[in-house]
Amino acid sequence: MIKASKCNKARALFLVRTSIPRTFIRNATSAIPTTVKLKDLSSLPPLTKSLPTNLPFLMPDTLHNLLRFDSKKEKQPSTDKSNDKDKPSRKEKGKDKEKENEERKDINEDEKYDIKEETDSKPTIDPNNPVSSKSSISSSSGGANNNNNNDDSDGRDDDGSPKDKEFLSPSDAGLHPPFLAIAMKDRPFLPGATRHLHVTDPEVIKCVNHMINSNIKSPYFVLFHVRDTNSEDAALDVIKDRDFVHEVGTLCQIIKTTGSEILVYPHYRVKLVDISTPNSRSERIEMEQDNSQTSYLKKFEVSYAVTQQLKDEPYDEQSITINAWTRRIKELYEKLAPKYEQPENKEEIMNNPSMLADFIASKVHAKPEQIQQILESSNVETKLELSLQLLQVEADADEMRQTALKNIRERTEKAYAQSLIKEYTKELLKAAGIGENSKVHKFDERIKHLKMPEEAMKAYKTEKERLGTQSDMEQNVVERYLDWLTQIPFGVYTKDSFNVKKAREILDRDHYGLKDVKDRILEFISVGKISGNVDGRILCLAGPPGTGKTSIAKSIAEALNRKYTRIAVGGVQDVHDVKGHRRTYVASIPGRIVTALTQAKTSNPLMLIDEIDKLDTTSHGGAARAFLEILDPEQNNSFVDNFIEVKVDLSKVLFVCTANYLGSIPAPLRDRMEIIEVNGYTKNDKIEITKRHLIPAAAKKVGLEEGRVVIPDETILRLIDKYCRESGLRHIKSLINRIFSKASRKIVEELEDTDADPHSREIVEESLVAKENESVISDKAKKDAGSSSIESNDSNTEAKVSTTTENEKKQEQKQKQDEEIKKLDLPADLKIEVKPETLKDFVGPEIYIKDRLYETLNPGVATGLAYNTSGDGDALYIESILTDSISSDLGNAGLHVTGSLKEVMKESASIAYSFAKQFMVRQFPDNRFFEAAHIHVHCPGGAIPKDGPSAGIAFTSSLVSLALNKSLPNDTAMTGEITLTGKVLAIGGLREKSLGAKRAGYTKIIFPKDCEYQLDEIPDEVKEGLTYIPVEWYSEVFEHLFKGISKEEGNSVWKEEFAKLEEKKKSKKTHTV
């Protein structure tokens, strides 16, 4: 039941929100008893001050229901005042003003009557469900209907009977009629603030326009947030199924539409009860929809849902937690208030905890999941806590921003003040004619020792004049340019030394072996001595890693008495790295060439361009083109760096390049170089280098005297064979260092064990005491000598010394001893010997366990030879087998190749297969092996990529061996490219392959006759014990590998298998007939 005061308020409410004459309302409501049931009032959307006053929240039909008219509904005038095509005249305005004054007078009378009614009957407060005594029917502007008000907001009358079933009125089960349901991916909408919604689905847009244009009295929809915002369908407006969205959303009213943009006002939170989608229609909703005012939704392919209003749980207004959090939120909000647009009902929001939580959550920056969590919460305390957390993060971020802005402002003001002081000081010094620029003086002093060309001197003077007339930033650029320009050693040269004898001594001192390399270098120096210079010569040291190319370049520089400088160009792809950046760029510097000259401080250094084969040529060859100019004797006398912008003469520079693989160097660059190949070291060379250089260097590095760690030749040999087979010395050097590190640890542990033995400790202490006595005596003698000199020079010193007590002296001496790190004194007889049997205790288990994969070769297995870019040679085994027996009559003869083979090696295998078939037909015509054999050829070591044509004769021999079912000799390895006609072509790396064959125990090597010239490059110690068999055609290879085989033997190998095959074929024919 509702009292008369509520009727009066409702009457005033209709007057404000509608255009119905007030006199009509007063006359109508005066006849209503005070006990009338008002079923529609609480179900209406809550009002808000932020919406337009001309928005018709209550339709005329609702008014008739309120007045309980049973007669036919009359058409009421439109309340839409937004269309103002016909502007009122001045007379009409005057009448409206008089009417407004009359209505205001009536409102004042109603308010007096309401105050009297409220005084007569004060609302009671339930302790479990506190209410606000300030209003009885008002709801929050955010639309959150609290249970705190003892009014009709629960959707039922005082007697518990259900209300009228208008479009917002809940059913008997407390459910709303079906509404249009829209899914959204962005931040969820919270009640109480007008928002813009963007929709893209054409059906949804049509439905919304229909609701607006058809004057539907229920322009409402429910909005739900998508669960998975990262899914492909997250941007859809139509809900696919119930699990597609969260269960809690908001009921929104459409205010205005503009294309795909909808201005909406979220009223309150709703819970999803049932949903009907275009893909899955709900029978329950469809049946109810037929009699519903929203039945028009069936016309569109949209989703619509039955919802239930989600109300806040009751809470205690006196709760300490709620009051504390509310107070803290208000404090933080006041600090951040300038950032946010202030609502008109701010006071009402601040006094309602639920509205305050929604308002704060709608303002702060947060993830959609966090806002959804607040939206789903019915507990006011929880909502406040979550909103406070978000607001606290916002406040902390704002504080950090303010601090950063303050620091920036302070730095800016300080820099401005410093610049003013600097300019003021500069003007004073200029006016006084004093204060010579120290930097300019430094530049002038530098050029006195240089022979700058005219172009460089002109640039220097021009830039020098600009100093003092530019801004600070520009002046820094000028100073940096002059600094670099005056560091270039124009006209500064070192005198060359062409002493061949001295050069030989330096090369022999620093390098063991490498006879061919040393001879080439000495020839180079001899030519320079005859011609008087080595200008225009560009050397390239090519060889495997770790063979000493860089150290050879240093020895050449020392032999020629030139400065040494190094440029690493591995991976360089930008031409500006070589030629510098222009001064217009921030923090630009010269390129690597000019920088190397400034480091060498001479114009004729030996400049090592290291790893030139690693130069990145993918970026349009920019860096490679720059080196074409630098390494060309006809062009490098006028090299121009982009930063310096003056010509620099590089013709006197001796360029030495290093590379591991010549094929990676661009051909134009390679043509400008004089190639000196630095091959790998032999086994004997490695042993001698280890003894002469690596062991002493490792002992010095760990602080041990030579002889403390003994490594015999047998141990070094085992280290080379089982751990370090590459041509270089880097790996063996690291292993030697590891041996000395382990030996140092063993020595320390052994001494610690000795300290634990009393007898041994006494011996060690006696030796240490004797050493200390010797040091004390020497220190005393020095002290006596020093004290006599002090007495003669200063008479007061003796008095000062006497004042120092003995205890202080002892403390100082002890402190000095603690601070000093003494070297460990080792007994003279303490040594560690690394034997071959104990080598694995120092460097770990052996890497190369077997030298040969096959001790005895089976038919179809051949031994080839291979080598890699690191200079390591090894045996390459070729295995061939039959995948099916010849008598199986499968009819799939062919070749299948595996073993991580690249394109060239696959082609080599195909060529060998074609030639082997032709060769067997010619040599053994009755051997029909290749007619029915499906062969699988494999190269062991599948993880290692293999390429190259040099395994051609090995492939052929493997196939012929399988066809003849005869094994190849165990002592013979082979290398050479094969052609379709059986010609054996030249290959490379014969020296490395010979090392691999000898290490694997092979004594004979079949190689192309065209490679006989390479035998002269192989050291005698490598050729010792090897027999080289040069061949020109494969028939010569066959004679060496298959000696004594007759035609009858070769023709009859597979006769039985082919006989069985023929019988099978005959039986098949008979069966078919």
UniProtKB/Swiss-Prot annotation:
Entry keywords, A to Z: ATP-binding, DNA-binding, Hydrolase, Mitochondrion, Nucleotide-binding, Protease, Serine protease, Transit peptide
Residue positions binding ATP: G543, P544, P545, G546, T547, G548, K549, T550
BP GO terms, sorted: cellular response to oxidative stress; chaperone-mediated protein complex assembly; mitochondrion organization; oxidation-dependent protein catabolic process; protein quality control for misfolded or incompletely synthesized proteins
Cellular component terms (Gene Ontology): mitochondrial matrix
Residue ranges with Basic and acidic residues bias: 69-107, 113-123, 158-167, 775-785, 806-821
Gene3D superfamilies: 1.10.8.60, 1.20.5.5270, 1.20.58.1480, 3.30.230.10, LON domain-like, P-loop containing nucleotide triphosphate hydrolases
Low complexity: compositionally biased ranges: 132-150
Compositionally biased region (Polar residues): 790-805
Domain Lon N-terminal positions: 177-395
SUPFAM superfamilies in UniProt: P-loop containing nucleoside triphosphate hydrolases, PUA domain-like, Ribosomal protein S5 domain 2-like
Region spans: Disordered: 69-173, 775-821
Alphabetical list of PROSITE patterns matching this protein: LON_N (PS51787), LON_PROTEOLYTIC (PS51786)
Keyword Nucleotide-binding annotated: yes
Family: Belongs to the peptidase S16 family.
Assembly and binders: Homohexamer or homoheptamer. Organized in a ring with a central cavity.
Name of this protein: Lon protease homolog, mitochondrial
